[in-house]
Amino acid sequence: VAAPAELTDEALAALSDPAVLLERAWTLEPWGRYAERSAILDALERLLETGGVAPPPPGRDWRLELLAERAIDLGREFKIDQAHALVDEVTRSANPDHEIALARAMLASGQALAWVGTDEATRQAHRAFADAAERFAAIGQPDWQGSALLRRGYSASYQHGDLVGAEELIREAIDTYPPDSMRLPGALVSYADVLIDLGEFDRADAEIDRALALTDRVGIAKVRVDLTWARARIAAGRGDARATERLVREAEREAIGMDWFKTHIGRSYLLESAELLDLVGVSDQAQRYFERGRDHGVEDNGDVAQTMAVLRARSGDPGLALEQLQELARGDWLEKRVVWRHTLLTAWATFRAGRDGAGELAARAFEQAVACGTIRVAQAGEPDITAALAPLAERAGSPVARELLLAGRGLIVRLFGTPAVVAPDGSEVRLPPGMPGELVRLLALHEHGLPLEVVLETFFPDVAPEVARQRLRQVLTRLRATAGDIVVRDGETLRLIPAWVDVREFFAAGNRVRGARGSRAVRLAYAALALHSGPLLPSDPYAGWAEDSRERVRYRHLVLLDQVAADAAARGSHQEALTALEAALEEDQNAEERRAAMNRHLQALRAQPAAT
């Protein structure tokens, strides 16, 4: 399918048939050639003002159809009040048989209402889009019908946080479009967007491949850019930093020949690129894209504030992040589909700032993500932070977080702070005092269990083997009577049933820091610190079997605290650095370098101007 040829000014001026001009405007829409479309509508307006135009056929009204198209374009540009005014004029003036004008006006109304974002406006948007789809079906316009379903799914469901409803409606739109529709590739892009948010990366890849095949045939440049951008989002969700950076740059190159960077679309692209690159730890490039988006020549700076809050909450100054996140929450409208992320980032900044309440906030964020469709929404959108906050949310009573930690396992075991064993239903597994509980804690340190001889030597070092085995059987009997079969014997090995154990997760999280870079390394360091909720095994202070683990935990804990303190100091985040250094000093009282660093940060804080 060839793209519509561009019209010269002379050719445009020569067009004198309103039907031809409207047809041209409709044709340009799926190609994203909005400047040309606007020029066509301007030409139609001038033609109608000069008069001398032949009367329209029955059921058509050139002026009302022009107003409906203008309303559609205004809605796309977020000029909501102006779009509503034109829609009202069309609906007041149209006769019932002006089907095209009324149907297109309903499409514009749905879009404008969806941008308002309130629950009531969203309900009205659903009704307007449904009305438009029915009208388009009645006049035999499946292409427009598909567009009404698509916009209902994307603007009224997806942006309002109903991802499951969005998937269903956009799937219906795709099935409604004729196979040769120019709008079908764009619909597949929107479908991929929803699947990406749902964490369905493989399915999204398949839809992108299908859209790419159609795009290669029809050559719509805008869709090609959108497809590349969707692949960048998938790469970021999978944690592939190299692919993310490459695809972001590729999308930018493809967009240069278009008018993206002359509009709000260009600003959004730059800011979202900054967020994606920061997500995978490409900090320097993330900062460059943010600065370009911040300096973009558009008056509204709400998007800039949102991205700045995201970057700061993830790995910048947590105090400033909390201030910005609170300011955004007090604003006119935070898009419903990202409310969960706003709450999650608030929880993360709260934790990093050393304040109380992070677990409760994370639990709320998880519930909000589930309300969008599934907890995979959070896992796909903020994978590191979701994983990091899950233990805090579980301690705050979140059943969603508990399921995340268990991942099909039979127990949650906490050895930091007050030891606790939690069953899949959230109830506490009470352990008998003495050796039965100590045995559980010992085995919890060793994912694959311990040889029976090691257990016997640990608990009964000076007892004859047969007597030791008899006593161990008594310990296991007491344990089984109270806690059930949570310890099993495999041949000559004793082990705990599959369990999530905080100290094992702490070591694994610390190991992940080593392979990361930039801002992501700092996030992963904080993620490991989130698991350290107190001294290791305080209930077994004299147990020799715990000494090695205690020393390893102490060393790793100090390394992580020093890492986040150094990063905070480099960014001038003095309170954040001070919080980390104070925690390190509790572990190591003799570190003079840390005391000196704390004094420097205290002096810097005193030198800061007081807030007004």
What are the functions of these language-model segments?
Residues 427-459, 479, 557:
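Short amphipathic alpha-helical recognition elements used for nucleic-acid or partner binding
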Residues 1-2, 10-21, 53-64, 98, ...:
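Intrinsically disordered, charged and Pro/Gly-enriched terminal/linker segments
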Residues 8-9, 42-54, 87-96, 129-141, ...:
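Amphipathic alpha-helical segments of tetratricopeptide repeats
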Residues 387, 391-416:
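Intrinsically disordered or compositionally simple regulatory linkers and C-terminal tails
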Residues 1-95, 112-127, 156-164, 197-202, ...:
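Inter-helical turn/loop elements of alpha-helical hairpins
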Residues 249, 253-254, 266-285, 291-394, ...:
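Alpha-helical solenoid repeat scaffolds used for protein-protein interaction
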Residues 18-34, 62-79, 101-119, 144-161, ...:
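Tandem amphipathic alpha-helical repeat scaffolds
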